[in-house]
Design a protein with these regions (language model features):
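Long, charged alpha-helical interface segments
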Residues: 49-142
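Anionic-ligand-binding alpha/beta catalytic cores of soluble enzymes and soluble regulatory domains
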Residues: 6-56
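Short phosphate-binding loop-to-helix
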Residues: 1-2
């Protein structure tokens, strides 16, 4: 039996139905024991936090961060290190109360939930690194 430390979904495209389904799959109950569940979609980063759980992110100061309850209600949602802190609030599904927050000057954001599945979108996270390219072949030296 496998026990991964992380699952990362990488995808994109212009089909909204595919986007919603793929991102939604990260909230599957079978993934709740995996310590880190995240994804890259069209160059934007997201994390999925299964409750009860905590997540700390280091993000560029003043960048945008959104908390969205995509999979049902989330209870006891707290966030600090942002312009607008939340302290143990309940988020209803797909309600914009957690949308468009701003990372504080320190760049460290702490998120905690008591129950539910919370999706965290952080659009300003750098794109994933590209695989290294092959070095050019050595050139001959003529003396």
């Amino acid at each position: 039996e496998m026990h991964p430390a992380r699952i990362t979904l990488v995808g994109g495209g212009n089909r909204l139905d595919h986007s919603i389904t793929a991102i939604g799959a990260l909230g599957h109950r079978g993934l709740m024991l995996i310590p880190r569940v995240d994804g890259w979609w069209n160059g934007e980063h997201l994390d999925v936090l299964h409750g009860p759980g905590e997540l700390q992110l280091t993000l560029p100061p003043a960048s945008t961060l959104s908390l969205v309850a995509l999979h049902g209600p989330c209870a006891g949602v707290s966030i600090s290190g942002t312009r607008w802190a939340l302290d143990s609030v309940d988020l209803a599904p797909l309600v914009g109360w957690g949308v468009s927050n701003e990372v504080g000057p320190g760049g460290v954001v702490s998120i905690r939930i008591s129950a539910g599945i919370l999706t965290i979108f952080n659009a300003s996270t750098p794109t994933p690194p590209t695989p290294p390219t092959e070095p050019p072949p050595p050139t001959e030296s003529h003396s």
